Amino acid sequence: MLDIRALRQDGEAIKAALSKRGYTLDLEEFAALDAKRKQADMRSQELQADRKKASKQVGELIKSGMAVDEAKAQVADALQTIDTELDKEVASAKAIQDEIREYLMGIPNVPQEAVPAGNDEDDNVEVRRWGTPKTLPFEPKDHVDIGEALEGGLDFERAAKLSGARFAVMSGGLARMHRALIDFMLDIHSDEHGYQEVYVPFLVGPEALRGTGQLPKFAEDLFKIEGERELYLIPTAEVPVTNLAADEILEANTMPRRYTCHTPCFRSEAGSHGRDTRGMIRQHQFEKVELVQMVRPEESDAALEALTGHAEAILQKLDLPYRVVILCGGDLGFSSSKTYDIEVWLPSQQCYREISSCSNFRDYQSRRMQARWRNPETGKPELVHTLNGSALAVGRTLVAILENYQNDDGSVTVPEALRPYMRGLERLK
């Protein structure tokens, strides 16, 4: 959520910055709401002054010799009228404040200056590449053909029988590799990158989703649970992990906070009809290892570079070629101020496909969820900056391994880094 004071002072500059996203900020609507708020505040102040004046009259009447009960009775009607009007104005002011908050909740984050202009993913800018795409001495198969031919392997038919489209069943060595990837990623981030592993609920309330920016704008992308309580299946571990700091003041000596977490993720993919309908690239349920950081404001830009490097390290250890792109304004996520996508090479498609997004949200999420830290220089609470990134999406990493490590006999070589997690298994057959 944007700072309302910044909107009042620099509305035109913010409007210009948001245009990089293709978003038009309605400053007239904001000005009208803010004027209503001021009017309600002024009316409340006037009524409070009237009440104070009426109460003072009671004292003056008593001083003039009137009995206490008689003095109170004389101004009772006036006080009652004032109190009734004051209650109405307080309720009106709250309604206006709620309206302003909803207006602010619907405004995306301001892109950083480094974010390139552009409309969609075609305008994203490549930053760097690592590794050389493998040239296979045979026609590469896609991960579906490879996985379905493995012993056990992938089974989309039974998954559809259970749950419909965009689900998968894995068994045998493939299921073990999927689990091995999760353990491998968590170990690297915990042991080498200094993240604290956390376990969180997979169901959250609406306020948690509002805090990170999924609600109210993206309700159609979520799975909501039917029952007495309003709960949602998490679309990413970002939601519960970032909200660990909601309504808290973090002490400076506990900063930065770095968390890594494995969760299943659930998405309706409402806007993805017809895209990646084959295989595991885009599913309603998938696993992800997430990185979340909460840092001092002056540290967040450097933290994004480090976090992105931590995600890249997984691909490097697995020897999977990839590239990093910076997202243009039109492709930037709603809550993000700057995002790097990491894209892994898929031989069957002869292109790079997204496997991770790493974002700096600055104080956009922390203002929504009131996540603060105590600045030792001022002694006052200030908003933290939040960041997160996929490190990595487990299913897509599995897809990349199947395709990049495939052999002409249909088997798949197990990457050396994973073999300790696979009981020494060197090949899936």
UniProtKB/Swiss-Prot annotation:
L-serine binds at residues 236-238, 290, 390. Pathway: Aminoacyl-tRNA biosynthesis; selenocysteinyl-tRNA(Sec) biosynthesis; L-seryl-tRNA(Sec) from L-serine and tRNA(Sec): step 1/1. Belongs to the class-II aminoacyl-tRNA synthetase family. Type-1 seryl-tRNA synthetase subfamily. The gene is serS. One of its GO terms (cellular component) is cytoplasm. Gene3D superfamilies: Bira Bifunctional Protein, Domain 2 (3.30.930.10), Serine-tRNA synthetase, tRNA binding domain (1.10.287.40). Its main location: cytoplasm. It catalyses: tRNA(Ser) + L-serine + ATP = L-seryl-tRNA(Ser) + AMP + diphosphate + H(+); tRNA(Sec) + L-serine + ATP = L-seryl-tRNA(Sec) + AMP + diphosphate + H(+). It is found in: Cytoplasm. The keyword GTP-binding does not apply. PANTHER family: SERINE--TRNA LIGASE, SERYL-TRNA SYNTHETASE. Keywords: Aminoacyl-tRNA synthetase, ATP-binding, Cytoplasm, Ligase, Nucleotide-binding, Protein biosynthesis. Consists of two distinct domains, a catalytic core and a N-terminal extension that is involved in tRNA binding. ATP binds at residues 267-269, 354-357. One of its GO terms (biological process) is seryl-tRNA aminoacylation. Its EC number is 6.1.1.11. The keyword Nucleotide-binding applies. HAMAP family: Ser_tRNA_synth_type1 (MF_00176). GO terms for molecular function: ATP binding; serine-tRNA ligase activity. This is Serine--tRNA ligase. Homodimer. The tRNA molecule binds across the dimer. Catalyzes the attachment of serine to tRNA(Ser). Is also able to aminoacylate tRNA(Sec) with serine, to form the misacylated tRNA L-seryl-tRNA(Sec), which will be further converted into selenocysteinyl-tRNA(Sec).
